[in-house]
Every structure is written in C-alpha cells, then in structure tokens.
Amino acid sequence: MATQAVQVFGKKKNATAVARCVQGKGLIKVNGVPLKLYAPEILRAKLYEPILLLGTDKFAEVDIRLKVSGGGHVSQVYAVRQAIAKAIVAYYAKYVDEHSKNTLKTALIQFDRTLLVADPRRCEPKKFGGKGARSRFQKSYR
C-alpha cells in the first residue's frame, strides 16, 4: 500500500514553508531540526500554538517534515505554523473523516484565522518624491 501523505504550504510575506504530512509517530521537523530546537526561543511558542490548540493526540500518529525558505525569522515562524495547521487539516480531510476535519478547522479559525488563511498584506513599493512608499520629502515655501 502507498504511504498516506499530503503536501501543503504556508506563506507569510516572502517566507514559504512546505509541509509534508505522512503517517508516523508524532515527529515534527523544520529544515531537519526538531520543533523544540527551532527558531529563537521567544518565537517557539508561536510554533506550538496549533499543536497545543488541537491537542498532542491529533499529532501522535503523523510525522510532519517542513522546509522553509525566504523572508525573516518572524515571517518564517508564521509560515511554519500555518503549514503545520494546514497539513493536519488536509491529512484529516483525506485519510480520517470529514467530521473531525471540520472540528479541527473551526477550532483553528476561532483561535486565529491566519493559521489556515494567508495574510494578503504585502510591502508597498517606493514612489518618487520621497524616501518611502508614503512619506514625502519636506516642502519649503521660501
């Protein structure tokens, strides 16, 4: 029998995290590093949000391996947490049942919508007449 696997991605600004969720024993690795060792310690709590919210029992029978690139540290953490949440929902939708998928989805959306839906905000391009997108050079009348 072929392995039960789903592949999803999470995005934030320029950071993209690709998650592959397969049947396993609860292993979660980001770029080959275990989740408990990844990222600055302060941001690690953000990574654990979908896991703590849904309960570790939901993640006990799956392995999630993620590859993240682009963006900064914070963007990468947000992309990873989105990929983890989307991966577990997609796995439950495909291989478990529709009812449990819906309960997972509603729990995630009630907590934080960006766990499943990408943030559309992007950096606005710079325009002439100033040093940024909106700021203008100082005007002198005399």
Swiss-Prot record:
Keywords (A to Z) from UniProt: Cytoplasm, Ribonucleoprotein, Ribosomal protein
Pfam families linked to this entry: Ribosomal_S9
Broad class of the protein's primary localization: cytoplasm
A GO CC term attached to the entry: cytosolic small ribosomal subunit
GO MF annotation list: RNA binding; structural constituent of ribosome
Record-stated family: Belongs to the universal ribosomal protein uS9 family.
NCBIfam families, per the entry: PRK00474.1 (NF001749)
Function according to Swiss-Prot or TrEMBL: Component of the ribosome, a large ribonucleoprotein complex responsible for the synthesis of proteins in the cell. The small ribosomal subunit (SSU) binds messenger RNAs (mRNAs) and translates the encoded message by selecting cognate aminoacyl-transfer RNA (tRNA) molecules. The large subunit (LSU) contains the ribosomal catalytic site termed the peptidyl transferase center (PTC), which catalyzes the formation of peptide bonds, thereby polymerizing the amino acids delivered by tRNAs into a polypeptide chain.
UniProt-recorded name of the protein: Small ribosomal subunit protein uS9
